Amino acid sequence: MTYLEVRDLQVRFGRRQAVAVDGVSFCLDKGERLGIIGESGSGKSVTCMAILGLLPEHAHVSGSIRLEGRELIGLPERHYRALRGNEISMIFQEPMTALDPTMRIGRQVGEVVAIHRAGEGPATHEIVLEWLERVGIQEPPRVANSYPHELSGGQRQRVLIAMALANRPGLVLCDEPTTALDVLVQRQVLDLLNSELAERASLFVSHDLAVVRHVCRQVAVMKDGQIVERGLIDEIIDAPQHSYTKKLIAAARLDEVQP
């Protein structure tokens, strides 16, 4: 059975039914990664939010999203809450908006763990320190006792990765996870994701073709809510078929992040 199957996904907003995603289809198995590239407004992030069940109430969603054969479209919110952070997780673009500025890091990571793993295995605090260390954070106890503003951008992004992976989800959605980082830190975070996502199904959303090339073999190009081209990323870079893909490649800085 395919782990994630998206078929003819359509997302429309408001009374005028403005189309954000139009007929998107793809499949992912465990260990597979699909990069989705396109400019702002192309429907990349909306696709992720539809999978995660976090679209606003005025969104009209149709088609099919199946996780291990279970239909997610129309799933009651109480059931979706049990999936988020446990079977499906997301690494967001901007840590300072994803993290609570008034709460220490250890508590934030710990709450994600406690929601789904209360009473299981080692104490929550031990799991928090283990994951902070695993994502490459130096001095995990100190960082766990810190507030988000006391950390660097790279440290905050690593915290988000720890939060997304701590419950060992089968599907990870990465929404522009390195956009706010400088090139050196970006490379370090991409190397970390390459390692940690190896056994999971994952979507990697970005406007940056060079970044997607570093972590994905397959890529889908989105424009105006539709997938206009899909295939092996190196083949698409060498011989793009769609005019929009050609423009993206012409604008890309493919030498900044080497595979």
Functional labels for PLM-detected ranges:
Residues 56, 72-89, 107, 115, ...:
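ABC ATPase NBD coupling module
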Residues 60-71:
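Conserved ABC transporter NBD signature motif
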Residues 146-151, 155:
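Conserved ABC ATPase signature
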Residues 166-170, 199:
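A short, proline-enriched helix->beta-strand linker immediately N-terminal to the Walker B motif
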Residues 187-199:
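Helical segment within the ABC ATPase nucleotide-binding domain
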Residues 212-214:
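A short, surface-exposed alpha-helical micro-motif characterized by mixed small hydrophobic
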